[in-house]
Amino acid sequence: MAALIPENLSREQCLYLAKLAEQAERYEEMVQFMDKLVLNSTPAGELTVEERNLLSVAYKNVIGSLRAAWRIVSSIEQKEESRKNEEHVHLVKEYRGKVENELSQVCAGILKLLESNLVPSATTSESKVFYLKMKGDYYRYLAEFKIGDERKQAAEDTMNSYKAAQEIALTDLPPTHPIRLGLALNFSVFYFEILNSSDKACSMAKQAFEEAIAELDTLGEESYKDSTLIMQLLRDNLTLWTSDAQDQLDES
């Protein structure tokens, strides 16, 4: 369990301790240090690119392990249901509820920071897209496990956040920019996994990939690795999604 952190830490100390926690793979504490840094620095000031990336890494690791846990528990729940083992099903459902509460808390934490501090503090197109994309990501993580009206609301909030990010990205960031590419990647995943709209997912991923390929020679050395990695992920998803569609055609 992450410990309470000292009250009187400076911005530099928070940054150093967040990096230390990252090295030690203590991501819950990394989140605490970055939360404190954000609350002390924004919305009056803006995070540096390094701080912004550390915040993203901290939350991504915490939410990543919870999402993985949720998928495993849900899969076990289905197996127990197929075995008609009522006692086990009851225990697994309760445990899944516990994981879902933690997921909700983590998402609520970062979404509050984004809404109150980070989006209002953003002055550049790059940082605006970064934070709006992040907002979309965490609403999407809620949509992965919520049901009924809560799922509908989370999906709506995801769509609004990604669309707001996309409007700025398409106007102000080049097609090869890693943040614009990352947005296209995650937005297309949202269409595929949450909205079950494989056509829209494929067309969005394909367009982003092709536009980036056309301008590949303009890529600076500093973002070449990031951009080409995301382009590879876009292509992997396209291959997977189109083969899925083909499988369904073969079956029907």
Curated annotation (Swiss-Prot):
SMART domains from the UniProt entry: 14_3_3
Gene3D superfamilies the record matches: 14-3-3 domain (1.20.190.20)
Record-level GO BP terms: protein localization; signal transduction
GO cellular component, one term: cytoplasm
Membership in a protein family: Belongs to the 14-3-3 family.
Subunit structure comment from the entry: Homodimer.
Record protein name field: 14-3-3 protein 10
Organism: Solanum lycopersicum
Gene encoding the protein: TFT10
